[in-house]
From Swiss-Prot:
One of its GO terms (molecular function) is protein kinase inhibitor activity. GO terms for biological process: killing of cells of another organism; monoatomic ion transport. Keywords: Allergen, Amidation, Antimicrobial, Cytolysis, Formylation, Hemolysis, Ion transport, Membrane, Pharmaceutical, Porin, Secreted, Signal, Target cell membrane, Target membrane, Toxin, Transmembrane, Transport. Melittin: Main toxin of bee venom with strong antimicrobial activity and hemolytic activity. It has enhancing effects on bee venom phospholipase A2 activity. This amphipathic toxin binds to negatively charged membrane surface and forms pore by inserting into lipid bilayers inducing the leakage of ions and molecules and the enhancement of permeability that ultimately leads to cell lysis. It acts as a voltage-gated pore with higher selectivity for anions over cations. The ion conductance has been shown to be voltage-dependent. Melittin-S: 1.4-fold less hemolytic and adopts a less organized secondary structure than melittin. The modification N-formylglycine is found at G44. Residues 22-43 form a propeptide. It comes from Apis mellifera. Residues 1-21 form the signal peptide. GO terms for cellular component: extracellular region; other organism cell membrane; pore complex. Disulfide bonds: none annotated. This is Melittin. Monomer (in solution and for integration into membranes), homotetramer (in solution and potentially as a toroidal pore in membranes), and potenially homomultimer (as a toroidal pore in membranes). Belongs to the melittin family.
Amino acid sequence: MKFLVNVALVFMVVYISYIYAAPEPEPAPEPEAEADAEADPEAGIGAVLKVLTTGLPALISWIKRKRQQG
């Protein structure tokens, strides 16, 4: 019985120390990336529009070809 109590205590100590271990700090964001994002908040919209204008016609033509084939 004493052995089981000792095993349980060791397990508890290891488990609690694992839970409360300090996590690694997250890396700080690069100041240049933050400045770029703040300077042009609509840059992402331009990328989305570019994908839509180039990819959408290709998708439509692919669908038309598939419908004609079968």
